[in-house]
Amino acid sequence: TMINGLGVLGWGVGGIEAEAAMLGQPMFLPQPVVVGVRVSGALPAGTTATDLVLTLTEKLRAHGVVGSFVEFFGDGLSSLELADRATLSNMCPEYGATAAFFPVDDATLTYLRFTGRGDAADLTEHYTKEQGLFRRDGDPEPVFSEVLDLDLASIEPSLAGPRRPQDRVALSNVWSSFVEAYRDHLEPGPKPSEIGRFVGEGGQPEPEEALPGGEVDPAQTAGEATIGDGSVVIAAITSCTNTSNPSVMLAAGLLAKRAVEAGLSAKPWVKTSLAPGSRVVTDYLDAAGLTPYLDKLGFGLVGYGCTTCIGNSGPLPDEVAEQIEERDLTVAAVLSGNRNFEGRIHALVRGSYLASPPLVVAYALAGRVDVDLTTEPIGHADGTPVFLRDVWPSPDEITEAVTQAVTAEQFRAQYARIFDGDERWNALDSPTGAMYAWDPDSTYVQEPPFFAGLDQADAEPTDVIGARVLVKVGDSVTTDHISPAGAIKPDSPAGRYLLERGVGQPDFNSYGSRRGNHEVMLRGTFANVRLRNELAPDTEGPWTTHLPGGEVTTIYDAATRYRDEGVPLVVLAGKEYGSGSSRDWAAKGPSLLGVRVVIAESYERIHRSNLVGMGILPLQYEAGSSASSLGLDGTETYGVRGIAGALQPGLQVTVDATRADGSVVSFPATVRIDQPAELEYYRNGGVLRTVVRGLLP
């Protein structure tokens, strides 16, 4: 989505859609609503493009732009450099839009020429001006379906969290937002994670005696680390969004320089890292002489690409992890990423905040979120308090650093060898031939079961009868909740699978790295450590209740039992189901577990498409209706009438929920198969089966 900042219209698709397109299937997109964002003013001193994009994400999520195109216009665009625009466009999935487009103007041409693409700039300028597409200040306003206003002068230093990218919070209110989100974990009494642990050890979700509780202990020493509730244990400069912006990256380096010169250092319990999205970043940090200061604070280069932002931070120091687990501490991460969904960053980190790279450095120095960085010191040097304002670089300093350190030659040199690879990459052996040779002993790649039985005709979809609810969740359940990409726990179904095959815990790697093995991925479905399944009250993690017996067990084990019993499965959800990453396994996994229907209040665009693409029927409650308003608790037996025979896009079907006492709640739901082609995919058991069947003689 970042290319939209350059005036190139593009949008993301699900992995299942992409696979189908590679095999010749057409792509379908309903005519979108186009929301215009009128931009005015300029960013105040002390604010960054990150503060702007977090404010925009909050604003657009509140307005509702799922499935819409967003287009920016107005004279305020002249104050935004191309890198700032790319930051806004790249975070488009977080506010739910299909695309976030900037028109071509002088800033676009300046960027193209600066990055060594002068010929492309000349052609772009000539073409867009001839076509009337070139933006100038004072142009007549385009016509949009809806228009919102964004005053850049109103932007303030911000973070977003601790659970969702749209939950923007002013810098001065970070601690209050943390307390509000985790009050139950910070106050005396049993915590959901403790109850979940007892369940995992064979206990009951409601023990006869209260679980150990009490006042939150004062911070205690773990090795050299003094940590407590609210401690920052991960501070990561990462993500394609922010590390592609020279202004915020050099601001982080300048802040690090001032902090080191003031005698400050990162707190010892904070795991710090730098993972830019481009090699050009380290080139200009080196050229500015700022790399040694970042290194001094622990922000050494760990690689280029997705790391902490997708859950690949690696383990915390042993003494820190032990304190978190033994005392059930509620700790935080601060990162310059796009996504901070629960359980995504690290299994031991409950709350995560998105922030600009310089604020990430500041929180590494402070080491905690129970601090107001606008009024309290970030640290002390020889007993003297040092405040954020003392080390924050001025706009002139940042501009000077960008001017002196960022050069066109850096881009040309890196682009020229972008596909070369290093010695280790080039030394890898790659298989040849038209057919892949499956290795039955591989724990990374296994032949998937999606094409089993293609020699037989698929049965027509039938009404759902006697289904049970596997998972019942609330609003904003993300694809990370459904199919996590991070670390695999040894006591999880996926971990036990790997151990049984001789894979030691140090070699578990992550769910994301093992997505070529369906046996791992179906065991990891709904395995997020922060999942709150209402069918297993007072727990967090991959738990559910097997019905009608009432046994609390893992979601994978319950699904296996239901499969053996011939019971189809249903998922009940709230609003924004499937938001976040366009993760195809968030649809493939539930399909393999036996989920036939999802009933939600609303869906994220790509996830809805992926569900259909895997043969799962997405149903949507009528406006104003929900599981709660209908009095559904998930223990009912479900039937869906209207699937057999006459199923059509947008059709209204009837859902019957039968309670244990025999009473029935019947309610209408809309079939969220939105295109005729999707109906064909659904009838064939999914898009992959449809495509492959079409290739067979």
Where would I find each of the regions flagged by the language model?
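Extended active-site and interfacial segments that coordinate phosphate-rich ligands
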Residues: 2-35, 250-257, 351-352, 357, ...
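Mobile "lid/hinge" segments at catalytic clefts and subdomain interfaces of large enzymes
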Residues: 1-136, 151, 248-251, 256-268, ...
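Structural motif
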Residues: 34-36, 67-71, 98-101, 147-149, ...
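Short helix/loop capping segments that flank catalytic or ligand/cofactor-binding pockets
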Residues: 2-6, 11-19, 46-48, 80-83, ...
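Acidic, glycine-rich flexible loop/linker segments
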Residues: 378-395, 607-681
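NTP/phosphate- and nucleic-acid-binding module
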Residues: 505, 509, 513-518, 523-552, ...
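Extended C-terminal subregions enriched in glycine
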Residues: 269-291, 295-308, 312-314, 521, ...
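Non-catalytic terminal/interface segments that mediate subunit docking, oligomerization
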Residues: 3, 7, 150-289, 426-599
